Amino acid sequence: MVSEMTPTRRVMAAVLGGRVDYVPPANPLAQTTTELMQICNASWPKAHFDSKMMADLAAAPYEICGIEAARPQFDISLEAEVLGCKLDWNKPDRPPVTGPAYTDPADITWPDNLEEAGRIPVVLGAIEELRKRYDGMLPVIPVLTSPFTVAGHIAGVENLVRWTKTDPEKAHAFIEAATDFVIAYGKLQTAYGAHILFPADPSASGDLISGETYKEFVLPAHKRMAKEISCPLILHICGDTSKLLPYIKQSGIDCFSFDAVPVWYCRQVMGNEMSILGSLDVIDLMPNGTPEQVYNRTRECILQGADIVGTACDVSFGTSLENLRAYVRACKETPIPKYDDVEDIIRQIGVGIGRNMKENVLGGMQK
């Protein structure tokens, strides 16, 4: 029996494959719901430019709902903006990139003093504020937009994906330049006090690229991040990553946060080589489901082998505080299961349901 832990110790242990007193509700996806923003008097776009407001909003899920993580930086366009992309600030929440900034990877540049570049000082200030406010008790987990996605922003996603087939040398050059920048920014976040980094690489989704493309173009970048950034990493990739999982677990990254893959299947593929974080639906369950449904789904994630429970993507604005609290309560009230393999998981969640999942869901993935 593990004695009561602080959120930071609990989340660190879960990410690194250690013992915990319960599966932590440590969601590193953005949780900027309308209610939370109203409670902490935050607004767009000011929360993207004000370190204090960013820290307040990042801490609100913990203060109001008990979610055991603070995630400063709410968008994944900051890195591309520093590299020269224009953003659309007319959107009501997170600014998207309006278009590519480069056609030739040799032209890519960024400011010499990264600490003062773009909105990076805002994020670094929020990290410092959160570390000071909680004295290390609450894990600070800023997002770090990852190389394939950054390369897609600055070159154009369609261009980058096409070049992986038609001009692989050019694709590699864009990804390598993006990797250099991402690692430099990640080291800064760590130096300013981040406990864990949350590399998000949505453009590396299995919905956009094949497993072989991931292996050739993305995996080397993820390996570099794991080797060159000193703090633990939780990698997130959206969509169906079933064909990518065997390669992702070779990355050296500590934990994988996933979207459209069954928890038990991710657990089976990763085994004990990588912690997993998953995966509450944000399209229907979190904004439209009842607290009871959220509670039950959270329990299912734990029973199927999740080391940490979080959402499949950023939480929608309309998600209620009651649903966020139900997710936290389920984590705290569900005993940690002990399984030897996926067959034990199947027996626990029901032979009929489990066998059907294994034959139909897994069979569909492998086609």
Curated annotation (Swiss-Prot):
Q: Which UniProt keywords apply?
A: Metal-binding, Methanogenesis, Methyltransferase, Transferase, Zinc
Task: Give the matching Pfam families.
Answer: URO-D
Q: Which cofactor does it need?
A: Zn(2+)
By its UniProt entry, which InterPro entries does this protein fall under? Methanogen_methyltrans, Mtase_MtaA_CmuA, UROD/MetE-like_sf, Uroporphyrinogen_deCOase
Cofactor: how and how many bound: Binds 1 zinc ion per subunit.
Could you tell me what reaction this enzyme catalyses? methanethiol + coenzyme M = methyl-coenzyme M + hydrogen sulfide + H(+)
Gene3D superfamilies registered for this protein in UniProt: 3.20.20.210
Query: What's a single GO MF annotation on this record?
Result: metal ion binding
Coiled coil regions, renumbered to chain: none
GO annotation (BP), single:
one-carbon metabolic process
Say if the entry is tagged with keyword Metal-binding.
Answer: yes
Query: For this protein, what is the EC number?
Result: 2.1.1.251
Q: Matching PANTHER family, A to Z? A: METHYLCOBAMIDE:COM METHYLTRANSFERASE MTBA
Q: How does it assemble?
A: Homodimer.
Function as written in the Swiss-Prot or TrEMBL entry: Methyltransferase involved in methanogenesis from methylated-thiols. Catalyzes two successive steps: mediates the transfer of a methyl group from the substrate to the cobalt cofactor of a methylated-thiol-specific corrinoid protein (MtsB), and the subsequent transfer of the methyl group from the corrinoid protein to coenzyme M.
Which protein, by its recorded name, is this?
Methylated-thiol--coenzyme M methyltransferase
Source organism of this protein record: Methanosarcina barkeri
Taxonomic path? Archaea, Methanobacteriati, Methanobacteriota, Stenosarchaea group, Methanomicrobia
